[in-house]
């Protein structure tokens, strides 16, 4: 590992992340891989050791792959988990079992959050320039022209000024990212609104070890008598959720006898379960008025809250980290202008709002306690399932909003064209190179920008000037070919990696798109796409739109183009054990 060189700066760190939850830890890993000095401050003394989120999607696993930790995360997951919606008689109303893995991973995965979070924390041990400070709540901050002075409570983890004697410590950063949850102090300091609604409906949530059911899947019971959920997590843990009626108090719901009555509907011996924890929850549908104000930004629950019904709260936060991480790295390292950070809100807000709306709508469909309303819903759902296209729409989760950026760090050559791939995630099939066989595409592309050409040499298509600019930025270049042409050396270029289309997935993608040249961002979103002859013009437009600089970084103000190679994470002294 190459350490960052000395820099002329009065900043204690480049980025200060408030909150050591999954979003903050993922963001810190992304920044760590890019060589960005990062400090994570957390008011708790350690990670939360009980499950909260219960579902990972394919995009989250792809992000964990990008930070070199997916192999450590996978042992704590249940891949290809089926979710069934049941009526009052426990007959299947609908089923979600999406079969495709276009982004390289299953779309639905159960997981044990404390153990996955512990792997994210352990991943930071790879980076000498990333630190985590426990017992260090942010109590305030003051922004000026080139940085933010942050006040930390307690001893501030002995960072910066003060500390060690009970007095507040200070820390100066170039940017601050609040990943500090729904009650975010960062959001309050920013003076940003958090508009939306809080449901009046309460739910008893209980996690149980030694799963009394034992099957690998999950179900949601749309029972008007009492809606419920039963979710297989992993490692023998099952979550049950039961709606609490208006005439039942929180104290009643937390009584062990109440839980026994609820579980009696599900298991034969409800008094013989190993409860990890039980809590009463309400669901929130809220979004911050701004995700960025000056040098302060918000991510995860600090930026948006949504009901649990699509399992997208955790995953939406990971999307935030993936979108914001590379942009912060580019700006801090001198490879892009500060305006690039404006595209974070521009891109993430619309999709987060769509996820909130979908989750809220699903909750309303599941939760009616009026039998006539529930009966009408059941009839409608069953009628829809008779139509094959509608059944596939639900089964394959086609209703899930996918990120598609119309504005932001993208260039649309033909704005408004419905079939344009620009602003969407590129697929991740398994491919071959001359050195590796049967590997996921992202593992070949690396962690930064990538220029892909089907059936052409990127240098010849871009021209020497554009090629040199992307190379100076740290981008990599790839010639995509049918597998039959992998070993042909006629157009070899020392700066271009030849990729063989192992199963024909890449050709199938290009079969339905006119574009043959793709500019991929580090988060694997397609920043621009065009036919070969337009590549030089699109390249120039992208440098302008993303405020990129071809010099590849200023060593006085950033880390340049130094990247850290992801190594296996050693055991971390900060990691916590999950429930048995």
Curated annotation (Swiss-Prot):
Family affiliation: Belongs to the PheA/TfdB FAD monooxygenase family.
Reaction equation(s) it catalyzes: 3-(3-hydroxyphenyl)propanoate + NADH + O2 + H(+) = 3-(2,3-dihydroxyphenyl)propanoate + NAD(+) + H2O; (2E)-3-(3-hydroxyphenyl)prop-2-enoate + NADH + O2 + H(+) = (2E)-3-(2,3-dihydroxyphenyl)prop-2-enoate + NAD(+) + H2O
GO BP term, example: 3-phenylpropionate catabolic process
HAMAP family in UniProt: MhpA
Keywords, comma-separated and alphabetical: Aromatic hydrocarbons catabolism, FAD, Flavoprotein, NAD, Oxidoreductase
Enzyme class: oxidoreductase
Lineage of origin: Bacteria, Bacillati, Actinomycetota, Actinomycetes, Mycobacteriales
Residues where FAD binds: 14-43, 291-301
Full protein name: 3-(3-hydroxy-phenyl)propionate/3-hydroxycinnamic acid hydroxylase
UniProt-recorded Gene Ontology molecular function terms: 3-(3-hydroxyphenyl)propionate hydroxylase activity; FAD binding
InterPro entries named among the record's database cross-references: 3-HPP/3HCI_hydroxylase, FAD-bd, FAD/NAD-bd_sf, PheA/TfdB_FAD_monoxygenase
